[in-house]
Amino acid sequence: MAGRKLALKTIDWVAFGEIIPRNQKAVANSLKSWNETLTSRLATLPEKPPAIDWAYYKANVAKAGLVDDFEKKFNALKVPIPEDKYTAQVDAEEKEDVKSCAEFLTQSKTRIQEYEKELEKMRNIIPFDQMTIEDLNEVFPETKLDKKKYPYWPHRPIETL
């Protein structure tokens, strides 16, 4: 049963190797070797444990009630399978991450379009050696001096100089 559950959750090591940074390759290789070791150990185990031959032990054990007592206790023993608390949480976080990645992707595409417009604007400006002050002020409005607000030279606030 454990082997079947593990078979469903295999790791794509090629994709995992592409994602991790170079300085983490040693840790990833160690993780991969541990995973292979544990997977091979689990593969050697049978799916169901072998049945206990209680008749053999009753015939060979000197104390008569001891084997019956062990058999009762063994049959009464129930090993609880721990409940999976974290898969739902991880799945929810994964969905949230997918949404945030999609949102970031759309924002990035809009930024790229804005930057391409700015780049096209920069490519189409007059060369600086042929520009006049008016051309410069038109292309870069932040260079224009405000003579109405600051009538005296240098026509800008002294704090910004």
Curated annotation (Swiss-Prot):
Does the keyword Plastid feature in the UniProt annotation? no
Which GO molecular-function terms appear in the entry? Answer: proton-transporting ATP synthase activity, rotational mechanism
InterPro entries from the xrefs?
ATP_synth_F0_dsu_mt, ATP_synth_F0_dsu_sf_mt
Residues the record lists as N6-succinyllysine modifications: 78, 85, 95, 144, 149
| GO terms under biological process | proton motive force-driven ATP synthesis; proton motive force-driven mitochondrial ATP synthesis
Q: Does the keyword Membrane apply?
A: yes
What does the UniProt entry say about where the protein is found? Mitochondrion; Mitochondrion inner membrane
Pfam families, from UniProt? Mt_ATP-synt_D (PF05873)
Quote a single Gene Ontology cellular component term. mitochondrial inner membrane
Keyword annotations from UniProtKB, A to Z: Acetylation, CF(0), Hydrogen ion transport, Ion transport, Membrane, Mitochondrion, Mitochondrion inner membrane, Transport
- Chief location bin: mitochondrion
Concerning its family, UniProt says:
Belongs to the ATPase d subunit family.
Its quaternary organisation is: Component of the ATP synthase complex composed at least of ATP5F1A/subunit alpha, ATP5F1B/subunit beta, ATP5MC1/subunit c (homooctomer), MT-ATP6/subunit a, MT-ATP8/subunit 8, ATP5ME/subunit e, ATP5MF/subunit f, ATP5MG/subunit g, ATP5MK/subunit k, ATP5MJ/subunit j, ATP5F1C/subunit gamma, ATP5F1D/subunit delta, ATP5F1E/subunit epsilon, ATP5PF/subunit F6, ATP5PB/subunit b, ATP5PD/subunit d, ATP5PO/subunit OSCP.
The name on file for this protein is ATP synthase peripheral stalk subunit d, mitochondrial
The primary gene name is ATP5PD
